[in-house]
Amino acid sequence: MPSHSLAFDHVHVISKDPHATAAWYVEKLGGHVVKSTVVLGAPQVYVSFGGPMVIVRGQRSAELAADKPGLQWGVDHFGLKVQGDFDGFCAGLRSQGVAFSMEPTDANPTTRIAFIHAPDGVSVELLNRKDQ
């Protein structure tokens, strides 16, 4: 029997403006800021969606950040499950000026998905599973 277990905890986003980015996740997607602090010299804001969190931090003094165009190896996006009226939720985001990289579509007979652009080049998948 293993002496440990694992559970998903967070997605970590590095942002040019962590407080504005955290506010975007709150205002557009309904997250809640549960903590705002400084870690290793950079502001860090914890945004909860009722489970694993999005942690948004700023640039540390010794770091150099750069924008990354195009497809990159590694993490591509993170997904948020939408319960309820998926198309209505997406329409509400669109009315707030949120840009979609993929419009709502049926991924399979039981799942609708869409992709939106979040601050700092982050891609967020929205999904609604009819069987859950």
Roles of regions detected by a PLM:
Residues 1-4, 7-16, 45-48, 66-132, ...:
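Vicinal oxygen chelate
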Residues 12-54:
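Core segments of cupin and vicinal oxygen chelate
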Residues 53-54, 61-62, 99, 132:
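Active-site/binding-pocket entry motifs
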Residues 54-56, 126:
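Generic preference for hydrophobic
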Residues 61-67, 102, 109:
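A short, acidic/glycine-rich surface segment
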